[in-house]
Amino acid sequence: EIESSYALDRLVWQRSNISSTAKTLAYSDIIGFSTYVWNKNYNYTLAKEIKTLNPNATLVFGGPEIAIENKDIFQKYPFMDIVIKSEGEITFKNVLLALKNNKSLEDVPGLLINRKGQLVDTGRAVRINELDCIPSPYLSGVFDDLMKDTQGVEWNATLETNRGCPYGCTFCD
């Protein structure tokens, strides 16, 4: 159902000129940002530029660098529409299905939603216990065209043996 309703048009995996990248992405309906310490500032600048060009684009952020405990997150980052609080694979799929079927995002667990600067927290998503249920982007062909178009680039696969912080501190977990 996702594949027939949405197209994965572009993977931005290298830092390119912000303005040209924003112009390329701006007229997408939904844009996802996987945010880490090494791309956080680039992603935020790119997202601001995209929102300037297309205020109707839905910008979805996730990743370990998003400060989900910050209750003022949408005042600080008003360009964010949706933040996925934990593992994104199933939650992002549920976001896409809700948007496609005109269902309320408030029924999708695991989100922070920006409602005109006010935070709506949809609770916790169910944790993925069996990582084998998630298709590998390498084995499913998601990266095939990208790798073919970038001959000479050394690619590395990531082997995930666990996820998240192992400590389970009460302030975070």
Residue ranges of predicted features:
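Glycine-rich beta-alpha loop elements in corrinoid/cobalamin-binding modules
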Residues: 2-130
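Radical SAM [4Fe-4S] cluster-binding motif and immediate context
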Residues: 132-173
